[in-house]
UniProtKB/Swiss-Prot annotation:
Family as reported in the entry's similarity comment: Belongs to the calycin superfamily. Lipocalin family.
Location(s) in or outside the cell: Secreted
The keyword Lyase belongs to this UniProt entry's keyword annotation: no
Organism: Mus musculus
Residues making up the signal peptide according to the UniProt record: 1-18
GO MF annotations, alphabetized: pheromone binding; small molecule binding
Keyword Secreted on entry: yes
InterPro entries linked to this entry: Calycin, Lipocalin, Lipocalin_CS, Lipocln_cytosolic_FA-bd_dom, Maj_urinary
Major location category of this protein: secreted
UniProt-recorded name of the protein: Major urinary protein 17
Tissue occurrence: Because of their involvement in the coordination of social behavior, Mup proteins are thought to exhibit variable expression depending upon gender, age and status of the studied individuals. Expression may also be strain-specific: in strains C57BL/6J and 129S7, transcriptional support is lacking for Mup17.
Disulfide-linked positions: C82-C175
PROSITE patterns to which the protein is assigned, alphabetical: LIPOCALIN (PS00213)
Annotated Gene3D superfamilies: 2.40.128.20
Length: 180
């Protein structure tokens, strides 16, 4: 009986692990990221980029998957007003990587997603000979569990982003009223 219980537990863990994907992996299905998303956390090695008046404090509303690109519908807050912005991110020659021009040249990947709950993105911005990185945690719902947030914080640390540069936006004005 114990052996059967251990086998079931092991298979459950394998199935949960198999559900996660990375845009650079073979099992990534870009079609499954199509739809509505909410910005939960932003992190950057240049914190000012994601602070209240930072150019990269963007709130994702939707990803629309096309054949070789993604249309990203985002909102930004300027002078307490929500503005909508759409960007087209094109596939690059690297597997699972997309590029978009916004305040410089950006490339990004999706290191982790389970499609149904969360998506973790890693972006590198190049502008005027300088670079910085940004990571975002996005959810299908307006907030995510503390476990997923902690996994995201660990991924940020793996990319050299300090915990003090991680901003939880689940209680910030994310232009949710503009989504209707």
């Amino acid at each position: 009986m114990k052996m059967l219980l251990l086998l079931c537990l092991g298979l459950t863990l394998v199935c949960v692990h198999a559900e996660e994907a990375s845009s650079t992996g073979r099992n990534f299905n870009v079609e499954k990221i199509n739809g509505e998303w909410h910005t939960i956390i932003l992190a950057s090695d240049k914190r000012e980029k994601i602070e209240e008046h930072g150019n990269f404090r963007l709130f994702l509303e939707q990803i629309h998957v096309l054949e070789n690109s993604l249309v990203l519908k985002v909102h930004t807050v300027r002078d307490e007003e929500c503005s909508e912005l759409s960007m087209v991110a094109d596939k690059t020659e690297k597997a699972g990587e997309y590029s978009v021009t916004y305040d410089g040249f950006n490339t990004f990947t999706i290191p982790k997603t389970d499609y149904d709950n969360f998506l973790m993105a890693h972006l590198i911005n190049e502008k005027d000979g300088e670079t910085f990185q940004l990571m975002g945690l996005y959810g299908r719902e307006p907030d995510l569990s503390s476990d997923i947030k902690e996994r995201f914080a660990q991924l940020c640390e793996e990319h050299g982003i300090l915990r003090e540069n991680i901003i939880d936006l689940s209680n910030a004005n994310r232009c949710l009223q503009a989504r209707e």
